[in-house]
Amino acid sequence: MHTVSLTHQLVAIQDDFDLDKIIESGQCFRPQKLSDGRYRFLSGGALLYLTPLGDGQYDAAWYGSDWEYWADYFDLGRNYAALRCSLAGQSSYLDKSLDFGQGIRVLHQDPWEMLITFLISQRKSIPAIRTAVEHLARCCGEPLSAEGDEVFLFPTPQQLCGLSEAQLMGCGLGYRTRYIQNAAAQASSGTLDLGALTALPDDALFSRLLELDGVGKKVANCVCLFGYGRTAMAPIDVWIQRLIDEEFGGRDPFPSYGQQAGIVQQYLFYYKRSTSRSVAHKK
């Protein structure tokens, strides 16, 4: 266990920013609210703790990066309050979603982590995805200790290549094990250069991801949106398809939102999933 020192800095965030909603919005699976009130985020080789102090002030403590890295991660260069205002009035359901989801932001996450995470996500609930991803990190990710908190970084392609099929299956990956093995082998050998894909336009990036074993349209869209910041891409999963059928008469509304389609998808997804679960709990 490697003990690391954290850099602390007071930061101010005045735009929409709700850490609980971000964590529960279905786009990230390792961030966590700790018992001491801190929020922990991991991305690539970087670690961040945010402690809310009130009035948009936070104690930010990080390792393996700087605040600029995390400002980009949280998409702080985009005004989400203004974006919500610009989207309002197009449909009553969207208006409810925008109000309910105030504070959500689309995170700019590590492409490698997003590829593996969303390969794992297929036919799994959000709690099950979190469990599998955490098991994978604990199995071969680098362990760190920071101010009394022990964490495991997300495994590199090389670290994943070092695991046997039995070890991967033991992380709850099931039939997805083959997909993870193939992706790790390609990324480790250089056959798959996720960094180089950044230069591709949306359609070419999407097509390249579809060439990977186990990657369908939903997974490719998720990696494009959450790993590469392609906000015109809107993943359609079970929740979103149900919403399209029930609220939009079966018509896909996302093309009409242009470059904001992926952000709109997050508001709609969060509202649909949250309200459906609330109704289910009351029954």
Language-model features, listed with the residues they occupy:
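HhH-family (HhH-GPD) DNA N-glycosylase catalytic core used in base-excision repair
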Residues: 1-283
